[in-house]
Swiss-Prot record:
NCBIfam families: PRK10424.1. The keyword Hydrolase does not apply. Signal peptide: none annotated. This is ilv operon leader peptide. GO terms for biological process: amino acid biosynthetic process; branched-chain amino acid biosynthetic process. It comes from Edwardsiella tarda. Keywords: Amino-acid biosynthesis, Branched-chain amino acid biosynthesis, Leader peptide. The gene is ilvL. The keyword Methyltransferase does not apply.
């Protein structure tokens, strides 16, 4: 069970790291 949680956490972190920077840059450009 804990292994499953670790795998899910790793996937979520990977997705966030991949998706968040472009979104942040886009929001920064829009606000600027």
């Amino acid at each position: 069970m804990s292994l499953l949680v670790q795998v899910i956490s790793l996937v979520v972190i990977s997705v966030v790291v991949i998706i968040i920077p472009p979104c942040g840059a886009a929001l920064g450009r829009i606000k600027a």
